[in-house]
């Protein structure tokens, strides 16, 4: 069954149209994308390795995330994507919204959650994720953009507004104005 995405305008208003994943977005339209930063209580961040068969960034390390399917909110998509890619089940109320960012073709919503899950208990998604690691947050920040470690918004350079939010979340802040 093909994956459908809802389309939005630049102001995030629904256009009441869908597009099939893989099709070119019509000019001036956007879809919803999500990223989920998972921290453990030691402050390490969970990274997953993209499968070698992925067309974009094969073998790179990233935080879990993906695209909202038609009819999903970004919060629902974040819960689904985290479960699909790692086997970590979260309820919407567990996710803390960190920020919204406008990317080329996507409205990206970033969330964070704290979960102590041993790597041996993760259920990686075949064809999408091949490995996982807990990395100290500072070490990850130092490696972001090195060609092997991706930023959450899929830019090669660190995303300036996001990193302070991740650090604040890691340090205990839980209230953000989006």
PLM features: what roles do these ranges have?
Residues 1-35, 41:
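Acidic, metal-coordinating catalytic segment for phosphate/diphosphate chemistry
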Residues 2-4, 33, 42, 57-58, ...:
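A structure-centric signal for secondary-structure junctions around beta-strands
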Residues 22, 59, 70, 97-178:
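Nudix hydrolase/Nudix homology domain
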Residues 33-65:
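A glycine-rich, hydrophobic loop/mini-helix early in the fold
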């Amino acid at each position: 069954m093909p994956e459908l995405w809802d389309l939005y305008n630049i102001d995030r208003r629904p256009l009441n149209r869908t597009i099939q994943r893989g099709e070119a977005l019509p000019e001036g339209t956007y879809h919803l994308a999500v990223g989920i930063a998972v921290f453990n209580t030691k402050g390490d961040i969970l990274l997953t390795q993209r499968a070698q068969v992925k067309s974009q960034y094969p073998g790179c390390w990233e935080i879990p995330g993906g695209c909202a399917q038609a009819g999903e909110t970004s919060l629902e998509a974040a819960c689904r994507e985290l479960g699909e890619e790692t086997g970590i089940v979260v309820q919407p109320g567990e996710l803390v919204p960190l920020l919204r960012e406008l990317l080329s073709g996507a409205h990206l919503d970033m969330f964070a959650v704290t979960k102590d899950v041993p790597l041996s208990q993760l259920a990686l998604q075949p064809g999408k994720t091949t490995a996982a690691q807990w990395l100290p947050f500072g070490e990850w920040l130092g490696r972001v953009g090195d060609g092997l470690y991706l930023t959450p918004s899929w830019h090669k350079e660190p995303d300036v507004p996001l990193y302070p939010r991740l650090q604040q979340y890691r340090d205990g802040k839980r209230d953000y104005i989006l």
